Amino acid sequence: MLISTRSRYGLKVMYELAQKYGAQPVFLKDIANAHNISEKYLSKLVIPLRGAGLISSFRGAHGGYALAREPRNITMREIVQVLEGEIAPATGARGRRHGEPADSHPTESVWSLLDKTVYETLENVTLESLIQAGRNNAINYQI
C-alpha cells in the first residue's frame, strides 16, 4: 500500500495539532511553514478531517484548528481512511470491506492477511503514541 502525499501531510497536520492539544488553536500557516508545505494544499486536507469530526476549526484572532478529540482517541487508521478511502493494501483485497472473507483462490488468503495486518497496525497507532515515540526518540543535547 502506498501512502499518498495527501495522507502523509494529513498525518503531519494531525500530529502538530496533537502536540498542541489543550492549548490555543493552531494556524494552518504555522504548520505549513514548519513543514515547508503549501498552506493552500493543507487547507484542502483539513476539510475532510473536519467533516469526519477529527478536528475543529475556530474563527477570529484566536482562531485556527484543534483536535476535536483527545490524541489517545484518534488512530492512524481513522486519519488515513478519511483521506484515502477504504484501506485495502492489496489488489485482491480491493472491493471488500475489512473482515469480509476472500474468494477461494489460495493467493487471496495472503492478500487478506496483508489487509488485516495493515488495518490492525494503523488501528493500534494513536496520535498519543506517535507523540510519545517522538519524545522517546528526541535527541538529548544536555551534558
What are these regions (language model features)?
Residues 41:
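Residues in the helix-turn-helix
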Residues 33, 50-51:
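Alpha-helical residues within the helix-turn-helix
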Residues 95-143:
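C-terminal regulatory/oligomerization modules of transcriptional regulators
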Residues 3-5, 11, 15-38:
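N-terminal helix-turn-helix DNA-binding core of bacterial DNA-binding proteins
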Residues 54-68:
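Beta-hairpin "wing" of winged helix-turn-helix
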